[in-house]
Amino acid sequence: MDKLVIFGAGSSILVDLEETCTRLGLDLFAIVNNQDGPSFAIDQEKVIGLADVSDAMLAHPMVFALFTPGHRKFALDQARGLGATRFYSLIDPTAITPSSLKTSEGVFINCAVTIGGMSSLGAFSFINRSASLGHHCTVGEFASIGPGVVTGGFVSVGRGSVIGTGAVILPGVSIGANAVVAAGSVVTRDVGDNCLVMGNPAVVKREGIAGYNEVGV
């Protein structure tokens, strides 16, 4: 495969993408710092700013190292504005994924993830380490699943939503677009669009939020 470009050097989750690339034996062409501020890269020599992005770099496939859906969408828009057209789905070799899994472009699946059969992951979705998704799960575009999340079968997570660390979502539950499930929550019923829920059982704490960190997609 071509060398890979990672967008988002200012995000601390970057190091996990670098480790996945190492486990896969993928070479990095560059790591783009798309915002002012320090870089979290393990390989600092690969870090460049937006002004240094070249046509040669844009010929390589790209992934995005940002957990917040709105930030990931912003970085994607930046990359497309520079002329990027190739977006790679990066799947850690320690993840257990079914042969029936459907993935779109730009997906990241971190280490030790388990996904059940007949599930689908939308474009630019992000599945963080040790999450366990049941069979027939659907994760929408730009949605982010936090570390250690557990879902039952037939769960649906809407576009741009975030499921916090260690949350549990019972079978058949639907999470709306740009919703946020707080860390450690147990979700027993459907969650509407743009809602923040938390607790065991999870209840609505806020409605009309833009999204995670008040940035929607």
What is each residue range found by the language model?
Residues 90-198, 202-205:
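Structural signal for interior beta-strand "rungs" in well-ordered beta-sheet cores
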Residues 2-21:
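Glycine-rich adenosine-cofactor-binding loop
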